[in-house]
Regions:
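Extracellular low-complexity, O-glycosylation-prone Ser/Thr/Pro/Gly-rich "stalks"
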Residues: 2-6, 13-62, 67-349
Length: 349
């Protein structure tokens, strides 16, 4: 073709164009009808189809920027019995097994709680048990901090071939909170000593409570040797001859036919050593009364041994050795039983 010329444009008849457009529209409509028909989804023999169900969109969760997940409640720690697990106490080869318990409420570790008996001294960490032989008698001492420390106290006992006799004592004074639990092979089980409420409180709280609960004449006992000791009134200079309270019991004692100094009445010494009933009656202020064996009548009026009363008030079953003849009418912390299995000694702060 010569340069500069144009190829003529081929024109289709208008009727052809119209026919083609019409055909395309018909195909589109037919396809839409097919896809919209249930027949378009294959149905299987069990009645199910291949079409996946359309799940409804979940409702949007309302959140807050300040909202925090609720923490799961923590489990309460398992409460440990005051006396601990007794099932692990080894059987005695001698008369009974003694186990010493640290009940200082975390004040001292086991390595700083000591016991001493018959030439042996150990911390609880070293040796928590002692196999008590027969014919043992005397005192077992307990110390906090060091085996020669000033925080100390003791229990008293005698052990026969098949029997235990013993007690805690406040006759001389208070040094440490102590409690005993004696268990025998026949099922006998008893406890004496300071109650658990007293063990639970701090030492300073016990000293303060003593001052709060006793009359004026006795308050100074909690300060004269603090923080180590609360002496019994019979050994305190204020109640001895020449002391501020030397005549505390004088008039009351004389009215009941007793001519002994106040310190001898507290300590059941002199003529009182041979007259336990009278000594107990004077200390409890029930001398001359008909109900001298009724504990509900004790310490109702002054003069009385309010030092002893305090330890009774805060002892297990209100039993304590507050003065030498506190065993009159069964009010002491003395325990005794045959065929003993073990003795637990709780040492507190």
């Amino acid at each position: 073709m010569p340069t500069g010329t144009h190829r003529p444009t081929r024109r289709f008849p208008l009727v052809w164009v119209f026919a083609a457009v019409t055909a395309l529209l018909m195909i589109a409509v037919a396809g839409y009808a097919f896809l919209s028909s249930p027949a378009a989804v294959p149905v299987f023999a069990d009645g199910t189809s291949s079409a996946a169900p359309v799940a409804a969109s979940p409702a949007p969760v309302q959140t807050s920027k300040s909202a925090k997940p609720t923490p799961k409640p923590s489990k309460s720690p398992k409460k440990v019995s005051f006396w601990g697990d007794t099932s692990t106490i080894p059987a005695a080869k001698n008369v009974l097994t003694v186990k010493i318990l640290n009940r200082t409420n975390g004040k001292y570790p086991d390595s700083k709680v000591y016991w001493s008996f018959n030439g042996q001294t150990h911390s609880i960490a070293e040796q928590p048990y002692f196999d008590m032989p027969a014919n043992s008698a005397g005192r077992m001492y307990f110390y906090l901090g060091s085996p020669t420390g000033q925080y100390k106290d003791f229990i008293e006992f005698t052990v026969g071939p098949d029997v235990f006799n013993g007690n805690t004592t406040r006759v001389d004074g208070f040094g440490l909170k102590l409690a005993l639990r004696l268990h025998a092979h026949d099922g006998y089980d008893t406890q004496v000593g300071e109650d658990q409420a007293t063990f639970a409180e701090d030492r300073s709280a016990t000293f303060q409570r003593f001052q709060n609960e006793v009359p004026t004449e006795f308050k100074h006992l909690a300060t004269v040797q603090a923080p180590y000791y609360i002496p019994a009134p019979g050994s305190d200079s204020a109640f001895r001859t020449g002391g501020q309270y030397a005549n505390y019991f004088t008039s009351y004692a004389q009215a009941n036919g007793v001519n002994e100094p106040t310190s001898n009445i507290f300590g059941c010494a002199g003529s009182m050593a041979g007259n336990p009933n009278m000594c107990a009656a004077l200390n409890r202020h029930v001398a001359g009364q008909s109900q001298q064996s009724d504990p509900s009548q004790y310490y109702k009026a002054a003069p009385a041994n309010y030092y002893a009363k305090f330890w009774h008030d805060h002892a297990i079953n209100h039993l304590a050795y507050g003065f030498p003849y506190d065993d009159v009418a069964g009010q002491s912390s003395f325990i005794s039983h045959g065929d003993p299995q073990y003795l637990l000694v709780a040492v507190g702060w």
